[in-house]
């Protein structure tokens, strides 16, 4: 075995290596402990915190499944089982519309990040900071996915979870099977034409990969919101861990085996006191990613950190390490040779995200998130359909559990969905417009945008005969064909032949996109405050948004 970095390690680095081995030994020992003894430790921990049983954070922490978590907020959840094309059985969690009268005919599909499950969407201690609940209040049909191998999806028709074969999957399988098969199932049940997709962290990467591999899937998604999107992370904060991440896959398998990564974490969740467990998580996040978690309240950590880990394969972690090493969003490389990039007679295929995705995309990223390289990411996505929002002083996990996630993230998600509502495209101008109901909420009584190249003006007056009045100069009608072609290219469901594109047209499209980005940014900044929503309030998110 080749160890390229041992001669460069500091004392601290050696300590980390030793701790990794100690964890492996402890993990092996824990497997020998009888289940009744583990249950006893868990009971002792729960007993020691019994004085706080009535707090919302303790109720969420101790809730064993998403059903109990949502029940705390008087929301019911359905289980749906999806059989993938390679015979894994996945669990989808659905929060159905309140009633047919409240259903807005829109379906949203949310997908979690690495080492997570659907629980992470529903563990905010304040109701209005749980994105699925806000969408539910607004009349959406909400679905939450789960990757193969996590706590809700550990079944296969002929591969037992104890076998190595069950855990032989990477991001490739998530993209080829889990995401598209889940979306197909949702469409079949709900009978709608398209879904709105929202991904967090690796969930975003899985969706980017899935959309890039299937033109058919592009036709079935209307919007995509990527929260804390991961694609080609810069690297890990700690030198030794970053070196390990970029080493041979065989070296990683030597550390962690070929099944579940860090299987002992589940036992630590159950047997450590919440205060100690949360401290361990904060220290690990600081070492690995330099995250300080100042935007997540201590009470919130009690609820959220208990839901932070769910099982996945070592191979999927190795896949991320290969991406870190190559700095390319590529498919998994099976070769075990550390120097194969110099000797292999082939190239590893990259996910064709820049050319094959035809969906409006919003990137919401933290300004101090060490895992997101937004400039590299935007270069790997279609320039004319991607918009981005930076949340200053926010890290990775802050975007779903931060104290201001409602106003800084959720409200902008809602605005983006409405801004790019397919029903808001003017037939006359072929320009995308915000929905009429939401334009009325803008601070000024008149909202005007003049197109930089075509002189198209859009005005909204409260006294007009309709909430939204679009006026276009007749002299600019000759440009509509160009606008129409551009919008078809961005939002079409089939490939458009662009072989005859000239430089002038590319410049025009770039200007159009910049104007759309400017309009969208201003629109997102008009988001209402959703703070008045809480677990005991009957006020819905819709009421809050419409309230002056």
From Swiss-Prot:
Keywords for this protein: Acetylation, Hydrolase, Isopeptide bond, Lipid degradation, Lipid droplet, Lipid metabolism, Membrane, Phosphoprotein, Transmembrane, Transmembrane helix, Ubl conjugation
Reaction(s) the record says it catalyses: a sterol ester + H2O = a sterol + a fatty acid + H(+)
A Pfam cross-reference name: Abhydrolase_1
Sequence ranges on the Cytoplasmic membrane side: 35-548
Membrane topology: Single-pass membrane protein
EC nos: 3.1.1.13
Gene Ontology CC: lipid droplet; membrane
Annotated ranges, domain AB hydrolase-1: 107-402
Modified residues annotated as Phosphoserine in this record: 462, 466, 521, 538
Sequence positions bearing N-acetylmethionine: 1
Chief site of localization: other
Biased composition (Basic and acidic residues): 502-516
GO process annotations (BP): lipid catabolic process; lipid metabolic process; sterol metabolic process
Active site residues per record: 201 (nucleophile), 369 (charge relay system), 396 (charge relay system)
Subcellular location(s) of the protein: Lipid droplet; Membrane
Cross-link (Glycyl lysine isopeptide (Lys-Gly) (interchain with G-Cter in ubiquitin)): 246
Region of interest (Disordered), residue spans: 449-477, 496-516, 528-548
Positions bearing Phosphothreonine: 539
GO molecular function: sterol ester esterase activity
Post-translational modification: Not N-glycosylated.
Additional remark text: Present with 1470 molecules/cell in log phase SD medium.
Biological role stated in the UniProt entry: Mediates the hydrolysis of steryl esters (SE). Preferentially hydrolyzes ergosteryl and zymosteryl esters. Required for mobilization of SEs from lipid particles/droplets, thereby playing a central role in lipid metabolism and sterol homeostasis. Sterol intermediates stored in SE and set free by SE hydrolases are recycled to the sterol biosynthetic pathway and converted to the final product, ergosterol, in the endoplasmic reticulum. Also has weak lipase activity toward triglycerides at neutral pH, however, the physiological relevance of this activity is unclear.
Protein name (Swiss-Prot/TrEMBL): Sterol esterase TGL1
Source organism of this protein record: Saccharomyces cerevisiae (strain ATCC 204508 / S288c) (Baker's yeast)
Top-level taxonomy: Eukaryota, Fungi, Dikarya, Ascomycota, Saccharomycotina
Gene that this sequence comes from: TGL1
């Amino acid at each position: 075995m080749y160890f390229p970095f041992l001669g460069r390690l500091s004392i601290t680095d050696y300590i980390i290596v030793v701790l990794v081995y100690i964890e492996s030994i402890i993990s092996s020992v824990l497997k020998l402990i009888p289940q009744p003894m583990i249950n006893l430790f868990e009971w002792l921990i729960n007993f020691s915190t019994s004085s706080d049983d009535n707090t919302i954070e303790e109720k969420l922490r101790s809730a064993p499944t998403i059903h109990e978590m949502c029940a705390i907020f008087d929301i019911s959840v359905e289980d749906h089982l999806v059989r993938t094309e390679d015979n894994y059985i996945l669990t989808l969690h659905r929060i159905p519309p309140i009633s047919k009268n409240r259903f807005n005919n829109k379906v949203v599909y949310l997908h979690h990040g690495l080492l997570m499950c659907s629980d992470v969407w529903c563990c905010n201690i304040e109701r209005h900071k749980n994105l699925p609940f806000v969408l539910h209040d607004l009349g959406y049909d909400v679905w939450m996915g789960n990757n193969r191998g996590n706590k809700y999806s550990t079944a296969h028709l002929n591969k037992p979870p104890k076998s190595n074969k069950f855990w032989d999957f990477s991001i490739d399988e998530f993209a080829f099977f889990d995401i598209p098969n889940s979306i197909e199932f949702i469409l079949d049940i709900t009978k709608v034409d398209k879904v709105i997709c929202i991904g967090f962290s690796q969930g975003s990467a899985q969706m980017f990969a899935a959309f890039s591999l299937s033109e058919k899937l592009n036709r079935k998604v209307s919007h995509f919101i990527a929260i804390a999107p991961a694609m080609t992370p810069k690297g890990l904060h700690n030198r030794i861990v970053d070196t390990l991440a970029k080493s041979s896959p065989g070296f990683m398998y030597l550390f962690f085996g070929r099944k579940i990564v860090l299987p002992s974490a589940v036992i630590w969740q159950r047997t450590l006191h919440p205060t100690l467990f949360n401290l361990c998580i904060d220290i690990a996040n600081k070492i690995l990613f330099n995250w300080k978690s100042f935007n997540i309240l201590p009470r919130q950590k009690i609820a959220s950190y208990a839901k932070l880990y769910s099982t996945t394969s070592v191979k999927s972690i190795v896949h991320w390490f290969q991406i870190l090493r190559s700095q390319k969003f590529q498919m998994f490389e099976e070769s075990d040779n550390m120097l194969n990039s110099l000797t292999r007679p082939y190239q590893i295929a990259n996910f064709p995200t820049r050319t094959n995705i035809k969906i409006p995309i919003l990137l919401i990223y933290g300004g101090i998130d060490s895992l997101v390289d937004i400039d590299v990411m935007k270069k790997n996505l279609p320039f004319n359909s991607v918009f981005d929002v930076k949340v200053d002083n926010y890290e990775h996990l802050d975007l779903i559990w931060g104290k201001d996630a409602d106003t800084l993230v959720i409200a902008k998600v809602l605005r983006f969905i409405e801004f790019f509502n397919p029903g808001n495209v003017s037939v006359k101008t072929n320009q995308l417009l915000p929905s009429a109901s939401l334009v009325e909420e803008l601070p000024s009584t008149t909202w005007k945008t003049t197109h930089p190249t075509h002189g198209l003006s859009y005005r909204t007056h409260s006294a007009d005969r309709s909430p939204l009045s679009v006026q276009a100069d007749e002299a600019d009608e000759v440009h509509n064909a160009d606008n129409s072609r551009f919008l078809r290219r961005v939002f079409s469901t089939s490939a458009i032949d662009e072989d005859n594109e000239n430089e002038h047209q590319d410049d025009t499209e770039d200007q159009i996109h910049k104007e759309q980005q400017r309009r969208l940014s201003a629109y997102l900044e008009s988001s209402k405050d959703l703070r008045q929503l809480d677990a005991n309030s009957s006020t819905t998110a819709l009421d809050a948004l419409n309230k002056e």
